């Protein structure tokens, strides 16, 4: 790919996201730089997620939909990756320079993807990137989903394709996003989440709260950190940091 190639694709993974999916689609359709293709994977939703996705595909030629059977419950970790790959394998184009795995409950600023690609163009070693993610907390206020600057938000995983191909994609297990970033750094790539105001993302549902409850999600996060071999003191410090 030429360094000036700004083509990118988006894979949205969505299960029971009828409340937020239309807003996510609208924020992508309003981007200053549109994706060459977007696949929405309806992961066995029991609400109107599938119908919303189908309507978007009828309206926009660059969107199409994959419907998966209902497995009976939301499957986190490896299930998210399986859903992503159902969309990735359904891509009609293979000619793109960047790719993004996106949750179905986000609002992106209009210059988001163009801004992230500019960051990539400015730093050829930057393999994965995102803006910072914020949760609404009422009365127009937001609270940041804290991650260190060297990590990329799992809700909006944007990759340079050359990096993605080298790391071999996502593993089908919990902490798939963190493992991908660690592998990227092992190969000499950089990963980063940027604090630029025009790259701020609104995540309408707190990360980890979509399956059962927030406590269960935080316990799952801790198990994932342990799985990756993080020191218990690091896990404790990181957990305390997320409380504030």
Language model regions located:
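N-proximal low-complexity "stem/linker" segments adjacent to membrane-targeting elements
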Residues: 1-30
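Cell-envelope/extracellular polymer assembly enzymes that use nucleotide-activated donors
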Residues: 6-9, 37, 179
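Acidic donor-binding segment of Leloir-type glycosyltransferases
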Residues: 26-72
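Active-site nucleotide-sugar/metal-binding loop of Leloir-type enzymes
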Residues: 81-98
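Short beta-strand-to-loop acidic/aromatic patch adjacent to the donor-nucleotide binding site
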Residues: 95-107
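Conserved donor NDP-sugar-binding/catalytic core segment of glycosyltransferases
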Residues: 107-143
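Conserved nucleotide-sugar donor-binding
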Residues: 153-168
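Catalytic donor/gating beta->alpha subdomain of glycosyltransferases that bind UDP-sugars
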Residues: 170-238
């Amino acid at each position: 790919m030429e360094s000036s190639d700004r083509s990118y694709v988006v894979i949205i993974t969505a299960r029971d996201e009828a409340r937020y999916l239309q807003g996510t689609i609208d924020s992508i359709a309003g981007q200053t730089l549109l994706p060459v293709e977007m696949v929405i994977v309806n992961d066995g939703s029991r609400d109107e997620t599938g119908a919303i996705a189908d309507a978007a595909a009828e309206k926009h030629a660059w969107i199409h939909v994959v419907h998966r059977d209902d497995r009976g419950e939301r499957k986190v970790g490896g299930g998210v990756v399986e859903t992503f790959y159902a969309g990735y394998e359904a891509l009609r184009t293979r000619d793109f320079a960047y790719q993004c795995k996106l949750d179905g409950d986000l609002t992106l600023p209009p210059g988001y993807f163009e801004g992230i690609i500019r960051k990539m163009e400015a730093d050829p070693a930057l393999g994965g990137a995102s803006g910072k993610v914020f949760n609404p907390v009422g009365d127009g206020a937001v609270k940041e989903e804290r991650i260190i600057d060297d990590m990329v938000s799992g809700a909006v995983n944007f990759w340079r394709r050359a990096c993605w191909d080298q790391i071999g994609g996502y593993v089908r297990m919990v902490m798939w996003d963190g493992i991908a970033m660690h592998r990227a750094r092992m190969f000499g790539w950089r990963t980063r989440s940027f604090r630029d105001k025009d790259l701020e993302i609104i995540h309408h549902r707190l990360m980890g709260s979509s399956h059962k409850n927030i406590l269960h999600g935080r316990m799952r996060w801790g198990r994932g950190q342990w799985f990756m071999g993080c020191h218990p003191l690091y896990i404790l410090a990181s957990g305390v940091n997320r409380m504030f």
